[in-house]
Amino acid sequence: MDDETSVKEKQRNSDRISNLPDSLLCQILSDLSTKESVCTSVLSKRWRNLWLHVPVLDLDSNNFPDDDVFVSFVNRFLGSENEQHLERFKLIYEVNEHDASRFKSWINAVIKRRVCHFNVHNEVDDDDELVKMPLSLYSCERLVNLQLYRVALDHPESVSLPCVKIMHLDMVKYDADSTLEILISGCPVLEELTIVRDPNDSLEVVCVRSQSLKSFKIDSERYESQNHVVTIDAPRLEYMNLCDHRSDSFIIHNIGPFAKVDIDVIFNVEYNDPLEPDDSSKIAMLGKFLTGLSTVSEMVISSDTLQVIHDYCKMEQLPQFSNLSRLHAYFEDTWWEMLPTFLESFPNLHSLVMEFDCFPDTEQIDLSYVPQCFLSSLEFVHLKTPYVVNMQKEGRPLTGTSSKRKLAKYFLENGAALKKLTVSASFCNIIDEIKAIPRSSTSCQVVMD
């Protein structure tokens, strides 16, 4: 009897769901993947074609037995008479010029349905075969999120994307330098922009001008071509990540006054060919770049960038970073002599993380000068050696003992505001010595992570 009651209860619940209006059922199905949504068509006649009216199309061609089945499926969905707005469209597919006509008809159909979230991931390998997006993409009035991977963009006469807030352009090729600039300028409420550059793209200038942009990331691997420029004018920018070993010039006209930045750039300066006094144009550009960053509140800086700054400091004085409260810097063992002068540029520094690949086996490092932040603001210091934490387990000696001791002593004896010094596990052989060092701040703790 209990089993019969349970079966009837399940039937009643099933009927309740089936009796819901189409609009609500489609909203429920939109939380499923398209594959799962289609599976509901076998439940009953009521559900047979319901998936065609779901405002989401999320498809990966790799989940289909062959290309013909995939094409037929997409054609059926987009070729239906349904004109309901699409909330999300995601397509993972290998598209080349041979498929261009069919692909563009799909995209035009999606744009006609006023899509909000648009994501095309092209799996083609040949750069010469990248399919061009239709020009209709530049006037999609409801579009909020645009993500493109390995496609080509034609030069537009105009762009009107009034609702786009998020744009990710990954390995995209542009018809001209101005293509990207016009695209960005046509997004008046854009807040998040990510650009991952194709090594073979033809861009010489990446120009980012936006009054609304809050987050900007660029990722560009090293490439032989030179004279590439990145220029940024985004007065509301709150976060910027420059990971670019390709461009040799960075021009910051404007960013937010308390932005957070992550900098890994080399300005086309080779490790074995450092900056020289006669590189006047490069030195001037570096000075303007650093001045453009001088209002930030938090900064992560790579060892490659710090190498260039190390060379720059031999010829010019760093600007004052008066707003900077948090700094995470990756140091090479040969740049320690710049540490006091470097930290003098951060008078209000609150937290410092110094990360090292290794420590030099020497005490011949001058750490006598005490920066202003040691006396008034620096409360937290973390000395990290992430690549040698397991050296003892691997049977390798812990190197740089004397320099580790000297560095820890430098912070403890001079850090009048210091509350905590954290050292990595590679300090384990001298941790007791470090804890015994007299401290300028009586409230300072020494801990090992």
UniProtKB/Swiss-Prot annotation:
The answer to keyword Ribosomal protein applying to this record is no
Instruction: Give me the LRR repeat coordinates as residue ranges.
Output: 62-93, 123-150, 172-197, 218-244
UniProt-listed Pfam families: F-box (PF00646), FBD (PF08387), LRR_2 (PF07723), LRR_At5g56370 (PF24758)
Where in this chain does the record put each F-box domain? 14-60
SMART domains according to UniProt: FBD
Stretches assigned to the FBD domain: 362-425
Q: What are the record keywords, sorted? A: Leucine-rich repeat, Repeat
Q: Which PANTHER family match?
A: F-BOX/RNI SUPERFAMILY PROTEIN-RELATED, PROTEIN WITH RNI-LIKE_FBD-LIKE DOMAIN
Protein name (record): F-box/FBD/LRR-repeat protein At1g16930
